[in-house]
Structure formats: structure tokens, C-alpha cells
């Protein structure tokens, strides 16, 4: 089964409603598998998902990196910039870091924005 994450542009209230909905489903014994990341505005989402960061995500999804240094070398990019990108993506929940390793836990990312 593929792991997916859904990106949203929304308010804390929107995020809270999704949380409460998931909580109630868990209370009823339902399994809750969806993952969500909410950004306060479109600019924040686009800042987190620059073309270079998307390239990094795709690369790490294909092959997890043993370290940020190894990832920077593999991508042919400056270590400092790759480190910044990894930190931003990890803070957004789109990358995982464990014991120095960098991995992308999701197979698909979808985005939703209300007008």
C-alpha cells in the first residue's frame, strides 16, 4: 500500500477540524491512515516546495541517504543549501531524519487549496 500525504492551505481551525474528525473515527474503532500537512498560505507551501526541494524529495524517495553530506554529494549541490532544504522539508513532515539518515516516507503528495 502506498503512503500518501495531503498538503493543505488552511487555517488552524481547518487543521483542528481534521484532527477532531480523526479522533472521533479512532474512538469508533476505525483505522485512521491519512496524513496531512497544513500551510497557513500558498506562499508558505510554495516556499517549502521549491523545484530544488521537490528534486531532493524525489531523489530521497528513490534512495534514502545515509547523511545530508552524502545527499549533497549525490545531488551535486552545496552542503549548506541541502542541509537547509532537508531541515525545511523535515519540519514540514515531508522528510524523516533518523540517526543521520534522510528518507522520504511518502509515495505520493497531493495538494488542496480552497478558493
What do the predicted segments below correspond to?
Residues 93:
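Glycine-centered, phosphate/nucleic-acid-interacting loop/turn motifs that mediate DNA/RNA or nucleotide
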Residues 1-26:
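General nucleic-acid-binding
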Residues 69-75:
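A short acidic, leucine-rich amphipathic alpha-helix
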Amino acid at each position: 500500500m502506498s503512503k500518501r500525504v495531503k498538503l493543505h492551505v488552511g487555517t488552524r481551525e481547518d487543521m483542528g477540524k481534521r484532527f477532531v474528525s480523526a479522533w472521533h473515527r479512532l474512538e469508533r474503532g476505525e483505522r485512521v491512515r491519512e496524513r496531512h500537512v497544513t500551510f497557513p498560505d500558498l506562499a508558505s507551501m510554495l516556499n517549502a516546495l521549491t523545484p530544488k526541494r521537490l528534486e531532493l524529495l524525489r531523489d530521497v524517495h528513490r534512495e534514502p541517504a545515509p547523511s545530508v553530506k552524502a545527499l549533497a554529494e549525490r545531488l551535486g549541490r552545496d552542503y549548506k543549501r541541502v542541509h537547509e532544504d532537508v531541515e525545511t522539508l523535515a519540519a514540514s513532515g515531508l522528510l524523516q531524519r533518523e540517526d543521520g539518515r534522510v528518507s522520504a516516507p511518502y509515495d505520493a503528495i497531493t495538494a488542496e487549496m480552497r478558493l
